Amino acid sequence: EYQETPSPKEDLEKIPMLARSDMKKEAAPFYNTELSVKGIPVVHHDIYSNGIIYLTMLFDIAHVPAEDIPYLGVLKAVLGYVDTKNYSYADFANEVNIHTGGISSTIGVYPSVKDKDDYQVKFEVRTKALYDKLPEAATLMKEMLFTSNIDDEKRLYEIIAELKSRLQVSISSAGHSVASTRAMTYFSKAAAYKDTITFYETLCDLEAHFDERREALA
């Protein structure tokens, strides 16, 4: 009832409003500095971040065959959720929460503004942490990337089954977005990396035939 009650005009007039003159015409500048650290290209963004460092590692995956693209989604789901050399996956999650604001992985697709068929695709691993926690964050990222036990078939099945269930709910609640992305795959190669339907079909197949596929998957 409170929300449905109209606000008096005098109260509405108290709400701060922006005039067109308050808005800047100039686009915000980029603060990008390209560096090379031990032969690795680095882009540094020198902007105020309230003492928090945002770190993203990018790995080129343009060489991955089209039929293997859905497995990148499986890899993304597995990293951080399996045991590593020094931690169980539960203990690893605790360490991540203690020292960082999270570690995640995703697939980044960067289309060209000039050519719809020209794009770059990267496998990205991200974290954010306070500056004095950067060594711990980097160590945990290294632990996850290089020592994750992706041969744990029982855990792999659990992750695949859970991911399939979550994706099923997501498709049901956002079918229009899923259909839109699928339609884009017919004229945009870059859209294939975001195709939820193909990924879901792959998960269904992996879950149904896990015993036959588990060794190849790992």
Regions found by a protein language model. Name each.
Residues 50-82, 86-215:
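M16 family metallopeptidases and their MPP-like homologs
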Residues 1-67, 202-218:
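Proteolytic maturation boundary segments
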